[in-house]
Design a protein with these regions (language model features):
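Basic, ligand-binding patches in group-transfer machinery
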Residues: 21
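Structured, basic alpha/beta domains of bacterial-type, RNA-associated proteins
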Residues: 2-10, 24, 28-31, 35-167
Length: 167
């Protein structure tokens, strides 16, 4: 292939359609805090979402205008981005989103599916899975495995122990 490595996934679309798709995915991510899509689309939207949160954390007019240009419905999603999401990730250096591979959502093509979500949010799947495992271990009277202890440490790092004990 001429030109060296590929810098992004083309997603079988031309440039305008690809940008429109990614803007739509990121807008839905900000609105609902998690989306279910294909793995390739999730990884590309993750890049744009990380940049969007970084723009929101700067809290200046150029960053606000750039974020407004990315989001499709800025009147509803920009206040959430600049308020709730910005405050949630002020102390975090990066890694605001997570891509979790899931079973294929389409039975006819078996394409790779994934969930793109914000970390430390109310719909955080790692937090829910860890809480479920801890509840099962407590009910059975078993010790936590090393993987479970690591996951407990990760999900409570920025969230604190209180929400985990409430589950």
């Amino acid at each position: 292939m001429a030109g060296g490595t590929v810098k992004y996934r083309h997603l079988s679309r031309n440039s305008a359609a690809r940008v429109a798709l990614l803007r739509g995915l990121v807008t839905q991510l900000v609105q609902f805090e998690h989306i279910h899509t294909t793995y390739a689309k999730a990884k590309e939207a993750q890049r744009m979402a990380e940049k969007l949160i970084t723009l929101a954390k700067r809290d200046n007019e150029p960053g606000r205008r750039s974020a407004q240009g990315i989001l499709y419905t800025p009147t509803t999603t920009l206040p959430k981005l600049l308020g709730e999401l910005r405050n949630r990730y002020l102390t975090r250096e990066g890694g605001y989103t997570r891509v979790v591979r899931t079973e294929s959502k389409n039975t006819y093509d078996q394409g790779e599916s994934a969930i793109l979500e914000f970390v430390d949010g109310p719909k955080d799947s790692r937090f829910m899975m860890t809480a479920k495992t801890v509840a099962r271990d407590r009910m059975l009277g078993q010790e936590h495995t090393p993987v479970t202890r690591t996951n407990i440490k990760k999900v409570t790092q920025f969230r604190g122990e209180v929400p985990f004990e409430e589950m």
